[in-house]
């Protein structure tokens, strides 16, 4: 059985104390003597010690020497126990240095635009006025006779990305079979409600722009829709017949902000 060489012989194979040289494949290089004992004794008895300079040393050479010494020791010893993961981990931790891996990600990249949940519904204000598309981009509130109830707008209410708080649920309101969504924009200094045409290949989506998003709040048997972009501004109707639906800031007054919602079957 092969025997482990004496530590002094192992050291002399790589280091000359007299000339302060570290011998490499390409020839000797002058180095200042500053040595350290590296202990591989965790593998068992018969420790092997290796002297390596801390200044101007070749890191790759040190790794090669470490591997050679470790493997020679493993080959030369007859182990009483099975080689375990901890033994390999001890060798690898001696050879390699751990460095943290930093991942840089953008929160926007983490947003998932998977299938958007939505429901179809109709809205009437508390005065039972229906919402009707009067022209391509104008939504009005008026009383409809029973034979004209088919004129009522059917909304596709999508549940979108946003903060849910105080029973307020972020939603977007699109018109069924139309590429139109209710949105809030500022005209002058006043927030205004409008119908905005969108690309059907893109909308609806989970991460809707804030101008499209409203907080839906249920109050008894009615619902309110508050603009996320302009807090305390609500989808409103007028007491006057056939007036456009608008964005108002007064609740419980002349402006009507509460609606009855009828959910339709899929």
Swiss-Prot record:
Belongs to the IL-1 family. The gene is IL1B. It is found in: Cytoplasm, Cytosol; Secreted; Lysosome; Secreted, Extracellular exosome. Potent pro-inflammatory cytokine. Initially discovered as the major endogenous pyrogen, induces prostaglandin synthesis, neutrophil influx and activation, T-cell activation and cytokine production, B-cell activation and antibody production, and fibroblast proliferation and collagen production. Promotes Th17 differentiation of T-cells. Synergizes with IL12/interleukin-12 to induce IFNG synthesis from T-helper 1 (Th1) cells. Plays a role in angiogenesis by inducing VEGF production synergistically with TNF and IL6. SMART domains: IL1. IL1B production occurs in 2 steps, each being controlled by different stimuli. First, inflammatory signals, such as LPS, stimulate the synthesis and promote the accumulation of cytosolic stores of pro-IL1B (priming). Then additional signals are required for inflammasome assembly, leading to CASP1 activation, pro-IL1B processing and eventually secretion of the active cytokine. IL1B processing and secretion are temporarily associated. GO terms for molecular function: cytokine activity; integrin binding; interleukin-1 receptor binding. The keyword Secreted applies. GO terms for cellular component: cytosol; extracellular space; lysosome. InterPro entries: IL-1_CS, IL-1_fam, IL-1_propep, IL1/FGF. This is Interleukin-1 beta. Monomer. In its precursor form, weakly interacts with full-length MEFV; the mature cytokine does not interact at all. Interacts with integrins ITGAV:ITGBV and ITGA5:ITGB1; integrin-binding is required for IL1B signaling. Interacts with cargo receptor TMED10; the interaction is direct and is required for the secretion of IL1B mature form. Interacts with HSP90AB1; the interaction facilitates cargo translocation into the ERGIC. Interacts with HSP90B1; the interaction facilitates cargo translocation into the ERGIC. The record marks 168, 178, 187, 201 as: Important for interaction with integrin. Keywords: Cytokine, Cytoplasm, Inflammatory response, Lysosome, Mitogen, Pyrogen, Secreted. GO terms for biological process: cellular response to lipopolysaccharide; cytokine-mediated signaling pathway; defense response to bacterium; fever generation; immune response; positive regulation of cell division; positive regulation of immature T cell proliferation in thymus; positive regulation of T-helper 1 cell cytokine production. It comes from Ovis aries (Sheep). The keyword Cell division does not apply. Residues 1-113 form a propeptide.
